[in-house]
Design a protein with these regions (language model features):
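PLP-dependent amino-acid enzyme catalytic core
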Residues: 1-333
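Short glycine/proline-centered loop/turn elements that form peptide/ligand docking sites
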Residues: 95-98, 342-343, 352
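Bateman (tandem CBS) regulatory domains
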Residues: 244, 327-343, 395-407
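The conserved cystathionine-beta-synthase
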Residues: 344-363, 370-371, 388, 408-427, ...
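Glycine-rich acetyl-CoA-binding "A-motif" of GNAT/NAT acetyltransferases
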Residues: 375-378, 416, 437-440
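Alpha-helical adaptor scaffolds
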Residues: 385-386, 390-392
Length: 455
């Protein structure tokens, strides 16, 4: 089969300087791996792993590629594998962004979702799950990025030489994250020969065990959880070579997401969650230096995969990652504040079809009905169903004829017990003071509040 021209677009990604963020005495450069055809640095290893397996006979025509992935390796494997005519079956943890999963399915990959709250050795851990599928399915090839030498080889033979050439052979440090460890290991091998004085700096999510390993040489048997996707580990990958790492930074989810958002606003670069982790660590490293250095880090993948998370104020607030000034009353529990312009609403003169479309597009079960800036009613899924059941033409009816207009409101100063009582009676919790409407509190909002309080 002829090599698809798309494969020629993998690699040779741009290297651009950071110009509007404080980098101290240093020059910081970003390698835009988001410009690969599949949108991430993992396109490199997708091609490398598949071609190596074809060369040694582990992957035969008509075979199935199986992998455990945080999404991006799966996208690289699906992009290459589907173009080459293979079936691609991927196992992903349930914390992966909706955009990644939809992208995988759109490429023709089959996706199995498993738990993200269990560790290596558990049958539902995504790597163990994928390995089991590979053993059970005839003709399957387990890509096994965490143990596959073709993973670091891709970076040793492409990413490393590109960086060295693009920096004009003037480079002091590279800031990397570690998931499978292929990027770090491959770059370490390349620069050990090309420029042994180049330092490696680890950017590690809070909860991962890797910073402690770099600092102490010990492998912790306890790890936490983190929302950043694609980097951080609860074990040391078999292919990992961390001997070149001179410093490691633990970066919280808050720092990671704030940094990704700052990068977009300051430099116009839309990167993913792990890009924020790397950037936060790179900026810390740069600002600590007392002499000028040239530093490279990565935009690991495109931020279009995280629009529903990192770049979604509602999601960020639900996770406790977007802070509002506390008001110390029920307004702090409202997920979408009306006075902040966050509420999706309808008007009495809108049709039921309009209400339905807004509920569907925003995944909401009820909408406030607003007229002249004031709350006049609530319409929910049950209202719609009662009106249109077996009468599809009723979608053209007006919201004002169907909405609930007799509302029981809660004053902002009401206590949480009053809120629970309202929700327990199956009512919508409307927070208002006189004619001033603040927003709705759902059961999910209350759960989020309790989770944030406990954490």
């Amino acid at each position: 089969m002829p090599t698809p021209a798309l494969f020629n677009l993998i690699g040779n990604t741009p290297l651009v300087p950071v110009t509007r963020l404080d980098t101290g005495l240093c020059q910081l450069f970003l390698k835009l791996e988001s410009q690969n055809p599949g949108g991430s640095i993992k396109d490199r290893i997708g091609l490398s792993i598949i071609e190596a397996a074809e060369a040694d006979g582990r992957l035969q025509p008509g075979g199935t590629i199986i992998e455990a992935t945080a999404g991006n390796t799966g996208l690289g494997l699906a992009l290459v594998g589907r173009l080459k005519g293979y079936r691609v079956l991927l196992v992903v943890p349930d914390k992966m962004s909706t955009e990644k999963v939809l992208h995988l399915k759109a490429l023709g990959a089959e996706v199995r979702t498993t738990r993200s709250d269990v560790g290596k050795g558990h049958p539902e851990y995504y790597q163990d799950y994928a390995a089991r599928l590979a053993r059970e399915l005839p003709g399957a090839f387990f890509a096994d990025q965490f143990n596959n030498p073709a993973n670091p080889l891709a970076h040793e033979t492409t990413t490393g030489p590109e960086i060295w050439e693009q920096t004009g052979h003037e480079l002091d440090a590279i800031v990397v994250g570690v998931g499978s460890s292929g990027t770090l290991t491959g770059l370490t091998r390349y620069f050990r020969q090309a420029a042994p004085n180049v330092e490696f700096v680890l950017a590690d999510p809070q909860g991962s065990i890797l910073t402690e390993y770099v600092d102490t040489g010990r492998v912790s048997d306890t790890s936490g959880s983190w929302a950043v996707e694609g980097i951080g580990e609860d074990f040391i990958p078999a292919i990992a070579d961390m001997t070149g790492v001179r410093k490691a930074y633990t970066i919280s989810d808050q720092e990671s997401f704030d940094s990704a958002r700052a990068l977009l606003r300051a430099e116009g670069i839309l990167g993913g969650s792990s890009t924020g982790t790397l950037l936060a660590a790179a900026l810390k490293y740069c600002r600590e230096q007392t002499t000028p250095k040239r530093v490279v880090t990565f935009v690991c993948d495109t931020g279009t995969r995280y629009l529903s998370k990192v770049y979604n104020d509602g999601w960020m607030h639900d996770q406790g990652l977007l802070q509002r000034p506390p008001l110390h009353d029920l307004r702090d529990l409202i997920g979408r504040r009306f006075d902040a312009g966050e509420v999706v609403s309808v008007a009495p003169g809108d049709t039921l079809l309009t209400a339905f479309n807004r509920m569907r597009s925003t995944d909401l079960a009820q909408l406030p009905v607003i007229e002249n800036g004031k709350l006049v009613g609530i319409i929910d899924e049950s209202d719609l169903l009662l009106k249109v059941d077996n009468h599809a033409e009723q979608f053209s009816s007006l919201v004002g004829t169907t909405m609930t207009s007799r509302l029981e409101t809660l004053h902002p100063s009401a206590n949480v017990q009053a809120l629970r009582s309202t929700l327990d009676r199956g009512l919508t919790a409307v927070v208002a003071e006189g004619d001033t409407f603040y927003g709705l509190i759902t059961r999910f909002d209350l759960l989020n509040h309790l989770r944030r309080t406990l954490s």
